[in-house]
């Protein structure tokens, strides 16, 4: 909590950009401080990835994965964007991390 506001980190496949944005708006209006992804690798931001050599791409993805774990550290809970029940390996890893660190886990579906 920050003051009276719960801090929520959004997790899920970045292919669900629209659902991320909807959840962010809804949770904000419910009085939550929302932490989200910085880039949508599967649903946009192609200009970031185009032209990156394989080594840079790998290091960037590893950095983003680690940064998202730090975002989970800052949160009271995570909210999983699991459209159609889909949870990929990265999201599953984030859920397991959140559970190990005592965070509440909620799901869109």
Predicted regions and their residues:
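Conserved catalytic or regulatory cores that recognize and/or transform ribose-phosphate-containing ligands
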Residues: 1-109
């Amino acid at each position: 909590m920050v003051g009276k506001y719960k801090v929520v980190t959004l997790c899920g496949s970045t292919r669900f950009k629209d659902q991320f944005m909807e959840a962010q708006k809804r949770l904000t209006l419910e009085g939550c401080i929302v932490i989200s992804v910085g880039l949508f690798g599967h649903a946009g931001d192609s200009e970031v990835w185009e032209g990156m050599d394989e080594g840079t791409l790998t290091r960037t993805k590893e950095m983003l994965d680690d940064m998202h774990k730090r975002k989970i550290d800052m949160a009271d809970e995570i909210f999983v964007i699991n459209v159609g029940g889909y949870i990929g390996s990265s999201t599953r890893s984030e859920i397991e991390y959140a559970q190990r660190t005592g965070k509440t886990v909620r799901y869109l579906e």
